[in-house]
Structure formats: structure tokens, C-alpha cells
């Protein structure tokens, strides 16, 4: 029951109307018996600083930050975790005793969750896309001790930036999507991760595969294919790879695991029920 003493958690982004976070977070909150409510707050770019700073003065226990603000909140934090600094993205904020924001990133934990029991040590990986999500993926692969990473993108500048940021941590290279090496790489790689929005619901390329279907003719049935998109589930890319005999993973587990890690962060280490969050999403969808 919501009372005058109920505290709140919120997701800040633009847009947020598609978000599933309130469904799974409120299910976990209810299960744990916490006097909290989680909601999504849309925010215009020009209003971000006003909104985030105003919330500090309310009965708020923490925030999730999503696109397009994961880098823009850095200047609003008095303390930032090492992992958030490394991937240059914050997705979770919590107020300290002085009512200042502490920023961290739980996307890495979320990304790792469905992979941690697959023994990927010394394996090779291919990342599709060089945007913000690729940073968390690279950091996660480093923590899983893979041997090398190749990033495929249409954008040379962002490729170079990622390589510069991570070249001291793992063997990493970037290729433009037109490179002739890619066909052989697709055939030989152990793990492929899609970080692009291609195939996502409510986009102009809902039915497409990253870089086009012909790009994937050489894919090997032994390859694990992981698409960070969770709506639709499965994506056209995962359907295609499943027909090729690949093991496939959608973004649902990452979504839940990063959310559980955020809720644990806000509640000072409370054990959060993954299955409760999963069941709530399954029922909703």
C-alpha cells in the first residue's frame, strides 16, 4: 500500500514509455515487503539537470538512468564507481548521507548473467555495433576472460575510440562492416553479441538483421549468439541464428539481472529475487 511514508525509485530517460522496469521492480519490491514504489519519468534533454537535482530533495531512494542520459549525469555525481568510469556510462544513482548522488553501472553485471556458466575463458567474440552498449559488453567480456574481441561497425570514429579505451585490457580490433575479413570471422568466432537496435520493436528496421541477412551466410552452428534486444523476443536475428543451429540468448536475462543489481544497490545489498522479476515480466508479456 502506498502511504505518506512511501519512498520512490524512478527511471529517467527519453523515451521511457516502452520500459518494462516498473513491472519487474515493483514485483520484487512487493515480494520483499519494502515501502517503495518504482516508476518511469520521461525527461526532456534540456530538463535533465533540473529533474535529477530536484529529485534529491524528495523522498527518493535511487534512480535508473537510460538513453540518452547515461553519460550526461556524470557531472551531477559526487562519487562514481570505477566500472562506470571505465565504460563511461552510469545507469544507477543512489543518494549518500550528504544527499549527493553516487553513480554506478549495473549493465555489466546484467550482461554477464546469462554467460557466466558457459566457460568462455580464452574464447573469441564478435561485437556488432560501436555505441554506448558496446562499452558495457566489452567490459563484461574482459571480466569473463575471453581472449580477443572484434567490433564490427559502420562508424570508424567510434570504433577507434573503443579500441583506444580498452586496448590495454584485452586483444581488441575494429572492422568496418564492408571489410572482407568478416565472413571468415563469423565462421570462426565463439560468441557474437548484437548491441545495435536492428530488429527492435517500434523501429524502422524491425524485420531486419544487423548488416543484412546475406552478411550471416557463413555463421557456424557452434557459435553462441546473444542479442541485447528483449522486445521482441526472439528478434529476427535470433530466429535466423536458431535455424542455423546456434545457441541463442535474448536480452531479457540482462534486463532482469541489471535491474536486480540496481535494487540491491539501493537497498544496501539486499538479496533480490531474480525469479520473481522474471515471472512478473513473463506474465506481463
From Swiss-Prot:
Q: Name one GO molecular function term.
A: shikimate 3-dehydrogenase (NADP+) activity
- Kindly list the GO CC terms recorded for this protein: cytosol
SUPFAM superfamilies for this protein:
Aminoacid dehydrogenase-like, N-terminal domain, NAD(P)-binding Rossmann-fold domains
Keywords, ordered alphabetically: Amino-acid biosynthesis, Aromatic amino acid biosynthesis, NADP, Oxidoreductase
Q: Give the source's domain of life in one word.
A: Bacteria
Main EC class of this protein?
Answer: oxidoreductase
Q: Write the Enzyme Commission number(s) for this entry.
A: 1.1.1.25
Biochemical pathway: Metabolic intermediate biosynthesis; chorismate biosynthesis; chorismate from D-erythrose 4-phosphate and phosphoenolpyruvate: step 4/7
**UniProt-listed GO biological process terms:** amino acid biosynthetic process; aromatic amino acid family biosynthetic process; chorismate biosynthetic process; shikimate metabolic process
* Catalysed reactions listed for this entry: shikimate + NADP(+) = 3-dehydroshikimate + NADPH + H(+)
What are the catalytic residues? 70
Q: Name one Pfam family in it.
A: Shikimate_DH
InterPro entries xref list: Aminoacid_DH-like_N_sf (IPR046346), NAD(P)-bd_dom_sf (IPR036291), SDH_C (IPR041121), Shikimate_DH (IPR011342), Shikimate_DH-bd_N (IPR013708), Shikimate_DH_fam (IPR022893), Shikm_DH/Glu-tRNA_Rdtase (IPR006151)
Q: Where does this protein hold NADP(+)?
A: 129-133, 228, 251
User: What does the protein in this record do?
Assistant: Involved in the biosynthesis of the chorismate, which leads to the biosynthesis of aromatic amino acids. Catalyzes the reversible NADPH linked reduction of 3-dehydroshikimate (DHSA) to yield shikimate (SA).
State the NCBIfam families in the record: aroE, PRK00258.2-2
What protein is this chain from? Shikimate dehydrogenase (NADP(+))
Source species: Prochlorococcus marinus subsp. pastoris (strain CCMP1986 / NIES-2087 / MED4)
Amino acid at each position: 500500500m502506498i502511504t505518506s511514508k512511501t519512498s520512490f525509485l524512478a527511471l529517467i530517460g527519453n523515451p521511457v514509455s516502452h520500459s518494462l522496469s516498473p513491472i519487474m521492480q515493483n514485483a520484487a519490491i512487493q515480494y520483499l515487503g519494502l515501502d517503495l514504489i518504482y516508476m518511469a519519468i520521461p525527461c526532456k534533454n534540456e530538463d535533465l539537470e533540473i529533474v535529477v537535482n530536484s529529485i534529491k530533495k524528495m523522498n527518493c531512494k535511487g534512480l535508473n538512468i537510460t538513453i540518452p542520459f547515461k553519460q550526461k549525469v556524470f557531472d551531477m555525481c559526487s562519487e562514481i564507481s570505477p566500472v562506470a568510469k571505465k565504460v563511461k556510462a552510469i545507469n544507477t544513482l543512489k543518494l549518500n548521507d550528504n544527499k549527493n548522488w553516487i553513480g554506478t553501472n549495473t549493465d555489466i553485471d546484467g550482461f554477464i548473467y546469462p554467460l557466466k556458466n558457459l566457460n568462455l575463458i580464452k574464447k573469441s567474440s564478435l561485437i556488432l555495433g560501436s555505441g554506448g552498449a558496446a562499452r558495457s559488453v566489452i567490459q563484461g567480456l574482459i571480466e569473463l576472460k575471453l581472449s580477443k574481441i572484434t567490433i564490427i561497425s559502420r562508424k570508424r570514429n567510434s570504433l577507434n575510440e573503443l579500441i583506444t579505451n580498452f586496448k590495454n585490457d584485452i586483444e581488441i580490433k575494429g572492422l568496418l562492416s564492408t571489410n572482407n575479413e568478416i565472413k571468415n570471422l563469423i565462421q570462426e568466432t565463439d560468441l557474437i553479441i548484437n548491441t545495435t537496435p536492428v530488429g527492435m520493436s517500434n523501429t524502422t528496421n524491425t524485420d531486419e538483421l544487423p548488416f543484412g541477412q546475406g552478411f550471416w551466410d557463413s555463421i557456424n552452428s557452434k557459435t553462441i549468439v546473444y542479442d541485447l534486444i528483449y522486445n521482441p523476443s526472439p528478434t529476427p536475428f535470433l530466429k535466423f541464428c536458431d535455424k542455423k543451429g546456434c545457441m541463442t540468448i535474448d536480452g531479457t536475462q540482462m534486463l532482469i539481472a541489471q535491474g536486480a543489481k540496481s535494487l540491491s544497490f539501493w537497498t544496501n545489498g539486499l538479496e533480490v529475487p531474480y525469479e520473481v522479476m522474471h515471472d512478473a515480466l513473463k506474465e506481463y508479456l
